[in-house]
Structures are given as structure tokens and as C-alpha cells.
Design a protein with these regions (language model features):
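Accessory RNA-recognition modules of RNA-modification enzymes
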Residues: 1-232
């Protein structure tokens, strides 16, 4: 609404109430974590006076500080499997001495970790490395596969570019399929590593129900989906 009225200068006579989500915890089907050798030091850390020996982090970027990452111990945005996977990968990489990425110096091995968990129960994990160190890659991917047999799509990427996007990168399947299945109202969708899908699956269904009701569709209507939000890639 703000973008339409303030930026586009579009007059909106009436704004309907926000359609709230019933689920406010563990509702996301996709999360992406970033590895960094420069963790964000919290106020609690500063007040404690403790020396922080481990500056590595696997978590979320800090707004306004692109090179700093807040290390996440427990995330409430996704199923707890996501927490277990993240903590396992973090601990394993540190134990093996795999360097967390330094985005300023463009150095290190471990870049990002993406977890997708579909409403069908299928799980996709994408590990992004900064260098083609195949022995280390195989070692970590093998450990993940052994620890988490529930992962149905285990993939990895070697991204040697400056930015983190993998849209133009080759995605390599280590185990399982190169997609997971998602379902909405009896319809099946194949979600690939580069696909876009509404991150709140349950709320997406509610959104589409509203759109369908407002469109007043009839059984013989021909409907075009021009947003192209879903596509296997």
C-alpha cells in the first residue's frame, strides 16, 4: 500500500484488513543461512565481558552491515529439522577446519546453506561452496547424507562469483532428486533449487482462495497465471 500510494502515486479508495496467518512460528518452507568468519557481536556479548574466541557464524545478515552475520542457535521460522541440519553442518565444518566465508576478502570455503521443507514432508538442502575442493565437498555431503536420511534432495553448488546468487550456477545433485514435491488443494508442484514458491505455504493457499473469490470465476472461464511465480529450475 505504501509503495502504491507514496511512490507510484496511485489512489486507493479502500484498503481491506490484513489477512493474518494462523501460524506465526515454523511457517516458512524455505530459509537461507549465510556462513561468515565475522559474526555480529550482540549487546549481551559486550555486556558479559567474555572473550569471544569463535567469530564464525552461520545465520542471517545484519541490516546495514553486509559483512556481519548473526549466529543462530535456534530459529523459530522453520521446522526444527532446519535447526538440526544447520547446527550439524556448522559443527562439522568447524571440526574439520573448513573456513567460513569472508565476503570482503572473498576467501573461505563455506558460503551459504538453503533449506526447503515442503508440506508433503519432502526436504531439500543446498550447500554452496566458494571453491571446487572436491574432497572436502564430498566429505561434508557424505556426512550430511548419513546424518539426515530424511533429506530427499541433497544438492550443492560451487559459486566462485562475488555475489551469492546461484541463479546462473550449476546445481549438482549429490543424492536423491533435483526437486521436491509441493501440494496445494490437490495440485502437485515440482520445486527445484532455483524455483520461487510462496514461503508460507498455508498462507499462500489462503491468498489464492481470496483471489479466486474476488475473481468470481465460472467453471468455463479460461484463466491465465501471468505472475510465473512457480517454475521448475
Amino acid at each position: 500500500v505504501d509503495a502504491l500510494t507514496r511512490i507510484a502515486k496511485v489512489e486507493i479508495p479502500e484498503v481491506n484488513p490484513t489477512l493474518g496467518s494462523k501460524e506465526t512460528f515454523c511457517y516458512r518452507n524455505k530459509l537461507e543461512y549465510t556462513f561468515s568468519c565475522k559474526c555480529w557481536i550482540t549487546f549481551e556479548d559486550l555486556r558479559s565481558g567474555r572473550e569471544i574466541a569463535d567469530r564464525n557464524a552461520l545465520g542471517f545478515h545484519i541490516p546495514g552491515a553486509f559483512d556481519k552475520v548473526l549466529d543462530i542457535k535456534k530459529c523459530w521460522l522453520q521446522d526444527d529439522l532446519s535447526n538440526r541440519i544447520r547446527l550439524f553442518v556448522r559443527q562439522y565444518a568447524l571440526a574439520k577446519g573448513y573456513e567460513f566465508y569472508d565476503i570482503k576478502a572473498q576467501q573461505g570455503l563455506m558460503r551459504t546453506l538453503m533449506v526447503r521443507i515442503a508440506s508433503t514432508g519432502e526436504v531439500m538442502l543446498i550447500v554452496v561452496f566458494a571453491r571446487p575442493e572436491q574432497e572436502k565437498i564430498n566429505d561434508l555431503m557424505g556426512a550430511i547424507a548419513a546424518e539426515f536420511p530424511e533429506i530427499t534432495s541433497l544438492l550443492y553448488v560451487v559459486n566462485q562469483k562475488v555475489n551469492d546468487t546461484i541463479a546462473d550456477q550449476e546445481v549438482i545433485t549429490y543424492r536423491g532428486r533435483d526437486y521436491i514435491n509441493e501440494e496445494m488443494e490437490g495440485l502437485q508442484f515440482r520445486i527445484g533449487p532455483k524455483s520461487f514458491y510462496q514461503t508460507n505455504s498455508l498462507q499462500a493457499y489462503e491468498l489464492y482462495k481470496v483471489a479466486r473469490r474476488m475473481a468470481c470465476l465460472k467453471p468455463d472461464d479460461l484463466v491465465y497465471d501471468l505472475t510465473l511465480e512457480i517454475g521448475r529450475a
